[in-house]
Amino acid sequence: MIITSSSFERIKSVGMRKLDFAIIDPHIHQWDPYHTPHSAALLVKALGNYPRVMDKVVRFVKPKPLLDTLGLTEYALSPYLPQNYHEDMGHHRIESVVHVEANWHHHKGFGVVEETKWIQQLNFKDQNLKLGAIIATADPRDRKFKQILKAHQDASPLFRGIRKMASWHEDSGIYRWCDQAHLYQSKKFLKGFEQLAKMDLSFDAWTYSTQISEITKLAKQFPQTPIVVDHLATPAGLFGPIGKKTGQTPSQRAAIFQQWQRDLAVLAEQKNVYAKISGLMMPVLGHRFYQQYRTATVYEMVNLLTPLIQHAIQVFGPDRIIFASNFPMDKANTTLSDLIQAYIEMITPYGDQAMYSIFRQNAANFYQLN
């Protein structure tokens, strides 16, 4: 199968169904480069009033793989706070959110606990939103990993687990979000990882699709630890060229999809693993709507993403699939309102119970939301 929008049977009409319950969005990011540790803090404070100049400077000093992942720099350089998320919601009813670590600049040792403290004090209530849980970060390789986890617990009663990104693509033109390949199989990582089960904590795993087997091995080694795969393990280049050599031709993109299908099916055999349908409009997948100075329509997203959603639900079942927005990381190519609507349309054929599970109950179960 060749993965292009013209490859799929066209959906003749896209309805605008509304959900009769409030959504839980278990994957959002918050940041404020003006007031928190941030890799671009100095730049933002100096040039924040001159966005075009700031964009040019960022594109000069930051690595191209990172810029290709972001697509547009403005969303990463601008504050994204509860009021910004609320504005993006549109007409959808969202009751509760889960904050997932956002690459806090003080990322070593106990520095990561600063992010948990900062998120805990953000005012979601004024936006009629509830902060349901915090997924922080910590490095299982750290000698003080257990103490860092306890510090997160002390910082917030909403702390439920961690994410440690292991996204490392063999194509060096695709941004690497960790400092070593095969992180999830490193001896130091595995030794520290044991603490999560002992402390009743969950793990958000994020890799590229070429690394799914590493998550499978991790899940087998720790069957008592709940693991959720973020962004369906990001099949980079599935919808277009990215990096130096990935997704360059229709046949390459077809191979990416087929390998992703096989590996995800094997991963789904591990019953402690859930999967988030999220992050599927990030530029790293090959989407280039932002280069057309527009966002994808609901219709376009339904056509592009339906094969991924169908396969994920087929292998995991509707009780282990979790909707999440990943906002604002997908904002270069879509609005939050249209993204939610597209997922509603794609999940409607599975029935009302599946809709409730995917948009609400599964997240509540996984993250132990009160």
Model features per residue range: what roles?
Residues 2-7, 110-211, 217-220, 233, ...:
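Active-site gating/metal-coordination segments in enzymes
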Residues 20-22, 92-98, 127-133, 155-160, ...:
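Short, well-ordered coil/turn segments that N-cap beta-strands
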Residues 34, 39, 47, 180-322, ...:
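Catalytic pocket-lining loop regions of alpha/beta-barrel enzymes
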Residues 29, 103, 139, 233, ...:
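Catalytic metal-binding/acid-base residues of hydrolase active sites
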Residues 32-83, 88-96, 157-182, 225-226, ...:
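Active-site gating loops and adjacent loop-to-helix segments of metal-dependent hydrolytic enzymes
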Residues 27, 97, 134, 162, ...:
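Conserved, mostly hydrophobic/aromatic
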Residues 1-26, 35-87, 96, 310-322, ...:
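Mid-to-C-terminal alpha-helical segments outside catalytic/metal-binding sites
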Residues 81-88, 93, 115, 148, ...:
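Alpha-helical packing segments of well-folded alpha/beta enzyme cores
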